[in-house]
């Protein structure tokens, strides 16, 4: 769509109504049928195991749903995963979860082979050629 909307938290302390930027970003991405939805968080991505040593760089929606049933993710992170799953099911091609504490994390994610966080997609058919090793 040639748009890059950026959604940020409320920045005025006297606002009486809280608007969740994660939920707002989800709704905008769904309405725009965005190619990508990016969440910056304090988590580096979805960990492969409970020891939190390695993260998935790419994972499918069914795999994320399975992990979500098997593990207890922190509440805030579980909400992000839930928004990402909803976006994926409602037409957003890719959801990226990135560690917002890393400098230049968006550049690293979009301009390197493995990226800097976890992306999840509906099916492996939506992977880019370089992600398939081709």
Residue ranges and their predicted role:
Residues 1-134:
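C-terminal catalytic "cap/lid" subdomain
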